[in-house]
């Protein structure tokens, strides 16, 4: 056990985490040179295309140092803000972490957030300055930033280039010297932390565990503590980047994959504790909460007959991603679908893309919303996440909305842009400090509803991509809010309703109807598009009707004949307008997301 090192890599997006993992794997000789490919740890196509890590992967490496063989377990963590729950699980199964910072970019908002999780878990942190071969690299400045913003001593920081492999050997030696070996009791009853789980078509649900005390053997009966269910261990494997390697036992301090032959992942929830069924441990490993959805949106199949396929697809994705929550809902405009809870915007995009890609579905997503707490006039309290379920205004005594604490790091020349943008979104400044002469850290309390739409994109475009952003949910605060409905041809389209601050309802409504006017296809009758709050119409646009030339078949002839046909057409249009239905294209539902 003294020769085991469990560590993970903490980094902001694009600071070179997956490349560094590739280099460590290569240096330890775990993968032959001919099998080596970029982003070896990122297994999903979406991960490779977007260059992000979503699922935490792990790999077991062997390394020789001063004549002894060591086992290094590298636990990869996602860097994006939505997946911080994956980070907290991965970090809880390590003793140390490499803090990777780009030598040209410096400290970013996400880096700070993840370092705090690591410090909470009392990990030994090794600062690593990556990309030092870039012309713009400034390792001294970056070390000062780390010391100033995080308070870590950087005198022993390592300089590496993951791309060229510079300094990788020294890094491995340092990992063995500075990261402590696991401390667990080998003779105690089995106690293991499940820090990831996924579904394999042949083996069923698999749990990736870190054994804290005791060991897990093939054939042993284990108990999952939160569900109280017992399962038999069918197989055990060590994770390896190309194919897992079978083993008979996973010992104290090691990580491994446990095969239980289960049909679904909900029985082995991430963050749960596994123990021996005959002699269970007294208490579970603490510090884990089930992932809470942060953003909700409706997902509907474009072809309503495929509702059951969507249900199956969501069930299968849930096997891999225990954080998705969903329940069926119906919409007048879109038919049958599901209300799905996500961890954040990127998570929502990734899930939608995976549903469309892996299950070949065409989906419409409604505008994302958050959970509101309402106190009604009769004193009762309710929570609402779908705007169309909001009770009438006269029944609501007060309405509270969730807030987040956002940390934004931005170059000082864009400071004005960012402050203007955040205050337009009802942000309240809590703190502002200069990291160095060119970069500023801002801390704001912002209503969650204001950041779920396109806050991140707007922040990036307003700062030429230089700002970084991270958030954590804080509390509910009272807000003066109203439901904005969109009516097309007199009918409310429930899927387009959004909840907005009252003082902004007019401009939001106006922007929405203008956007919709461009999108709604012209009909044979004119279509009114209106925005309303309660029963009051606050904005309107009209889509003009298409003229059909009914007099085309009259060659010459009497004017009264033509007039008769035109009158008849007018009557028909009137009737059509009264009963006509307007088919809304997919873009109409996205228009809600685009208004600022």
Curated annotation (Swiss-Prot):
One of its GO terms (cellular component) is plasma membrane. The keyword Cell membrane applies. CDD domains: EF4_II, EF4_III, LepA, lepA_C. One of its GO terms (biological process) is positive regulation of translation. One of its GO terms (molecular function) is translation elongation factor activity. Its EC number is 3.6.5.n1. Coiled coil: none annotated. Belongs to the TRAFAC class translation factor GTPase superfamily. Classic translation factor GTPase family. LepA subfamily. Keywords: Cell inner membrane, Cell membrane, GTP-binding, Hydrolase, Membrane, Nucleotide-binding, Protein biosynthesis. It is a peripheral membrane protein. Residues 2-183 form the tr-type G domain. It catalyses: GTP + H2O = GDP + phosphate + H(+). This is Elongation factor 4. InterPro entries: EF-4, EFG_III/V, EFG_V-like, EFTu-like_2, G_TR_CS, LepA_C_sf, LepA_CTD, LepA_IV. GTP binds at residues 14-19, 130-133. It is found in: Cell inner membrane. Required for accurate and efficient protein synthesis under certain stress conditions. May act as a fidelity factor of the translation reaction, by catalyzing a one-codon backward translocation of tRNAs on improperly translocated ribosomes. Back-translocation proceeds from a post-translocation (POST) complex to a pre-translocation (PRE) complex, thus giving elongation factor G a second chance to translocate the tRNAs correctly. Binds to ribosomes in a GTP-dependent manner. The lineage of its organism: Bacteria, Pseudomonadati, Campylobacterota, Epsilonproteobacteria, Campylobacterales.
